[in-house]
Regions:
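Short, mixed-charge low-complexity intrinsically disordered segments
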Residues: 38-71
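Short aromatic-glycine-(Arg/Gly/Cys) micro-motifs in beta-strand/loop hairpins
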Residues: 1-40, 67
Length: 71
């Protein structure tokens, strides 16, 4: 099973997580792309890695996200 992280209630998915982005204050940046089938969205191969990334998105941006199973 593979997983994507979706911005709560939207069709936007995490495409990049940079916890050290220097141009942001506080440091850190999360980027999103639109579309369930967008190839730029990050695909996590384990639920554990998706959960860690979800926690990092919360830590950086404070956004509510969900982990979506990809069939």
């Amino acid at each position: 099973m593979a997983y994507k992280i979706r911005l709560g209630g939207t069709n936007e998915f995490v495409s990049a997580i940079d916890p050290h982005a220097p141009h942001c204050y506080p440091p850190g940046e999360v980027k999103f792309v639109e579309g369930w089938s967008n190839p730029a969205a990050i695909i996590f191969l384990t639920k554990t890695s998706a959960e860690r990334a979800k926690d990092k998105v919360w830590e950086i941006e404070g956004f509510h996200t969900t982990i979506e199973e990809m069939l």
